[in-house]
Amino acid sequence: SQIIHNAGGLLYYDGANLNAIVGASRPGDMGFDIVHSNLHKTFATPHGGGGPGSGPVAVKSFLREYLPGPIAENKDRKYNWYQPENSIGRMHGYHGNFLVTLRALVYMKLLGKEGLDKLGAYAVLNARYLSSKVSQIIPLAYDEPCMHEFVASVKDLKKSHKIKAYDVGKALLDKGFHSPTIYFPLIV
């Protein structure tokens, strides 16, 4: 991160998948200046059916004045609205997807520090267990340990049995399981 910062750059952490590191490390300590978190992936908020989703953004203090405003600010145990000096202003009508963010906060408070510390470890453990089971039927795209997610490829099933990723996804839904992302490009 120091090389980027020395060149005048900023580091952005795509916290869409914090699952594997939650409770174990903090992106800000790794040198990242801006972090977003898709709450539905890590903190048990709804996302199905197109939303409502929520992706709060956290920044280092030197970027605070550039955040969209207004921001709730706590001064002397009283909350007020604060409009950052260099803000582009409001990004969303009213208060955004406030209830989704509140639900994530309640989930984190219920887990507590100890529960949050276990959250990442369990995400990795669950993904590795599931990948070992899935790989008995559908080969994994990569032969290496996964963290909180893995990619399976039905390329061979398509050739041998004309079964597509879409078919597997629909079969999972029929059995009551949420279908994973299908047709994920393996070049990512």
Where are these regions (language model features)?
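Alpha-helical scaffolding segments of alpha/beta enzyme cores, especially the outer helices
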Residues: 2-6, 129, 167
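Residues at alpha-helix termini
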Residues: 7, 30, 136-137, 175
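Terminal amphipathic helices with adjacent charged low-complexity linkers/tails
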Residues: 137-168, 173-188
